[in-house]
Amino acid sequence: MTTAPLERVRLRFTLLDTDANGYVEADDFERLAIRIIKAVAEPVSSPKALAVLEGHRRYWRGLVDDLGADHDGRVALHEYVTHVARPERFDDVIREYAESLALLLDVDDDGFIEHAHFLACMRAVGFHPASVDALFAELDPYGAGKVAVRAWVASIKDFYGSQRTDIPAQRLLAVPSVG
């Protein structure tokens, strides 16, 4: 894995490790999902919120199933790096995760995500506002103030699975996250 994709992997791990204990665990995924749901003021019991929770849970199960040889219920950075080096093994998991996030943020179900919801979600994850704004601008080339759901889903999938450095989500590494 080259430097830029490895930086993305490390950043993802840091953001997923919501309690900063050096491991990613099931509770981290629950905390992250709840933070995102609350950030966009969605009722936790709504279908969209439940889909986000399930997307995070499925991501966790896919991760631990792939790396669960030691059955300790947690994933260290070196294990995470091993897992993500094979993105094809979890493409469906990431797609579901990405779609659930995008549909949550499409609050009026018009196929687009407005900047305020995008920023709220990405801040809840832990990204720096300047990086989020740079990514949003990349995904909104006409300055309409909104991003197509399908464009953001593709960007999330690239962030998790691509080895390329010319992807829009690479902008998220421009400024350190705010943890």
Regions found by a protein language model. Give the residues of each.
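A short, hydrophobic/aromatic-rich structural module that often spans a beta strand
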Residues: 79-101, 135
